[in-house]
Amino acid sequence: VDAVTGIYVIQATDFLLASVPFALKLERSYYSTNNTVSVLGLGWKFPYASRIYRDTRDVEHTRVHLETITGHSVCYEEQDGRWVNQSKGASRFLMEVQEAEITGQERYVLTDVVDHTLSVYDARGLLQSVEYPNQQSLSFAYGEEGLERIVTPLGNVLQVECRGGRILQITDEIGRRTQYRYEGDLLVDVVHTDEGITHYEYDENGHISSVTDQNGSCYLENEYDVKGRVTRQNFSSGVYQTFTYDDIHHRNTIYYSETGKTEIYEYNNRFLKERIIYEDGSFQTYQ
């Protein structure tokens, strides 16, 4: 749980493949306050589902939005033939529109000056490739149902089965596969490459309320407030944590049943942690 925002976060890696310039990870992430439905269901994100779409609500400006492969949400506005970043904290990204050499169609090229990558999107806004500084690239192919194939810089192929806007299965060249099962918009089971199953239960608002691991152990139960922030976590060992939020004074309090102690987290208007106050009165500051 993020102590400042109260968001319950899951980071999971479903595939790890040898690649260059570094190993390729197929990861998924969950955020309890995320109300969007992705290719992996409500609250989940899959980085290579990144796409660009036009803002049709703003008739006065020409704007596009995208969530990058790094998880940043970015908005660009066209001004005098240039695409100008409208998002705070996202100056690492630069975007331009180019004409594809073969098709002659427009393509969007997003430069990440931190990771030194180029993410290339076609005229439909679909991610076509991620190009690395060593001239290697990761490429993507699509069918009627969505993403069909991922080709790594080493030429290895991952086959992706989609239906109804959801990823159902990813299979590599030696037959290893990860499967995803849903109930409506909710991802309930992930069947891993070793055939173990991680199971997720959800509350009435679509927040993950419990997680059962591949050994069949329900190791975590969550309770939430109306904003999707965790208010209590119960662990299989019997210990628990509670979370209290003071939005007015920007102070959150966490109680740990195992030690009987509390910690107070203070943060600024940008939700950046400024100070942790401990039970004994000592504190740690952040700048």
PLM segments and residue spans:
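Extended charged/polar low-complexity repeat regions
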Residues: 26, 32, 42-46, 53-287
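Intrinsically disordered, low-complexity segments enriched in small residues
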Residues: 1-40
